Amino acid sequence: MGKLIVVEGTDCSGKETQTRLLVDRFEKENIKVKRLSFPMYDTPTGKIIGACLLGKPDMVNNLLKTDGGFFPEGGGNIDALAAIDFYAADRRYNLPKIIDALENNDIVLIDRYVTSNMAHRGGLIDNKEERLKMYEKIELKEYVINELPRPDMIIFLYLPYEYACILKKSRKELPDEAEQNISYLKKGENAYLELSELYNYDIVNCVKDNEIRTINDINDEVYS
């Protein structure tokens, strides 16, 4: 059974880029590696999340033929307990892919996993005691009830919101409803930092001396 390594991160922190670079480095060392990413937008559960919940512009136009997601309050404002089930269902639906990857590779890299649910849903709760309870509920839901494998390592890429705004200006991809919600993003960022301390994640700071680090510089630290 291979090792499960999860890469989490704040908005625009480069989760996809870093996991793809890790795949390249592992393959050069003849290490069998598989990369997965959640939500899996090309699956039925992923399409529900991308189009109906988050209102991703390209998916909405192709699937729903409307101007936004199904939820009038916006993807970042949906009741936390209701929202966790969408993301948890996507991982449970794709559990066979995770198990197959672990059984046939030395390392499985996942871009966003259960921690993402904990941060983005828990971050919506201002009361710390209730927020910690939410973390526990999500762990129970995903790891115990849905039987997802627990990660061997979680790497957290930390890019503060104000620096993410700089990178967003150069992006061609249109933001979804959650990505346009500043309060949602900032609360998620704070929750990620709290989770990193509570669960002892490996934190990689994407900013040094008030400058965003280069992709390769960050990857060297992630790989080490």
Regions found by a protein language model. Give the residues of each.
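NTP-dependent small-molecule kinase module
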Residues: 23, 162-224
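Walker A (P-loop) ATP-phosphate-binding motif of ABC ATPase nucleotide-binding domains
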Residues: 4
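Walker A/P-loop
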Residues: 16
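ATP-binding Walker
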Residues: 12-13
